[in-house]
Regions:
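Hydrophobic cores of alpha-helical transmembrane segments in multi-pass inner/ER membrane proteins
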Residues: 55-64, 155-165, 230-241
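Hydrophobic alpha-helical transmembrane segments
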Residues: 53, 81-86, 125-129, 152, ...
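Short helix-perturbing small/polar motifs within transmembrane alpha-helices
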Residues: 153-196
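Alpha-helical membrane segments and adjacent membrane-interface helices in multi-pass membrane proteins
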Residues: 95-158
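Membrane-helix interface motif
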Residues: 34-38, 196-208
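Hydrophobic transmembrane alpha-helices
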Residues: 36-114
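N-terminal secretory/membrane targeting signals
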Residues: 2-39
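C-terminal transmembrane helix-loop-helix hairpin of multi-pass membrane proteins
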Residues: 179-189, 209-263
């Protein structure tokens, strides 16, 4: 009797997880047919060839370690595939939402904070570059020549900061939800800071050089990106709460500490 109840409970949990995953994938499918726009990703052909090659080389070690990390997790526990796929879909959905800025540019959330919290920054680099390739080829969002630069800012630099913030604050008495919020939102903002520096290095200002140029690019992104970072932080907290409610066994399988257990 107890075994039957346990099986029924497990089936209910799997149904809830499946429903959550389907909801994320449905949103991704809807956004896949959205009209294109000039967004935060550095567009095709915008960077000089030398910069494209350099940023691509910088990304390679992270991608290698990330692939090994994901492969190891899947080999250790096949059930982690669901969370990995969900984290990737979360990146795609949020990074496809293009919000026009009053400065004439567009901004969007990154969604990489969730994956960094669950799997670490290197693993997110793989998820991020898959999303970036898909967006560049099918949505005209970003570009293949600028793939290295976009990958470094969105899928490497931002997730690293998110992971560091999460790990650092997790050792304190700060509430878990606040920790997740800060990790996701500040990681999002840092992505735009890195993008601004990348553009400034390629196109320094005639007066003030790289620093002045970076400040100008930051000024273009800031009006929309600041509120978007807050929204991303809130959405990430909501997803983590949902996972802690419906996917406890999957979270334990990847050694993620559940809030109630921490308390």
């Amino acid at each position: 009797m107890k075994k039957q109840r346990k099986n029924n409970t497990e089936k209910m949990k799997n149904k809830k997880i499946s429903w959550l995953a389907k909801a994320v994938y449905a949103a991704a499918a809807i956004l896949a047919v959205a009209p294109t726009a000039n967004a935060m990703h550095i567009m095709e052909g915008y960077l000089p060839p030398a910069f494209c090659i350099a940023w691509g080389i910088v990304c390679l070690p992270f991608l290698v370690f990330g692939f090994r990390s994901l492969n190891r997790r899947v080999q250790e526990n096949r059930r982690s595939i669901t969370l990995i796929a969900m984290a990737g879909a979360f990146v795609f959905v949020l990074s496809s939402l293009k919000i026009p800025s009053v400065t004439g540019s567009c901004s969007h959330m990154t969604g990489t904070g969730l994956g960094a919290i669950l799997f670490g920054p290197c693993a997110v680099s793989v998820l991020g570059i898959i999303v970036l390739i898909f967006q560049a080829v099918l949505l005209a969002h970003g570009g293949l020549t600028t793939l290295g630069a976009n990958c470094f800012s969105m899928a490497i630099a931002g997730p690293i900061l998110s992971w560091l913030i999460y790990k650092g604050l997790s050792k304190t008495r700060i509430n878990r939800r606040i920790t997740v919020f800060l990790a996701a939102s500040l990681g999002d903002l840092f992505t735009y800071c890195v993008t601004s520096v990348q553009l400034a290095l390629a196109y320094p200002s005639a007066q003030g050089g790289v620093t002045a140029s970076a400040v100008k690019f930051l000024g273009i992104f800031a009006p929309t990106q600041l509120p978007l970072a807050v929204i991303e932080g809130i959405l990430t907290v909501v997803v983590v709460i949902a996972l802690e409610s419906f996917a406890k066994s999957e979270l334990k399988a990847i050694d993620f500490e559940i809030e109630e257990e921490k308390e």
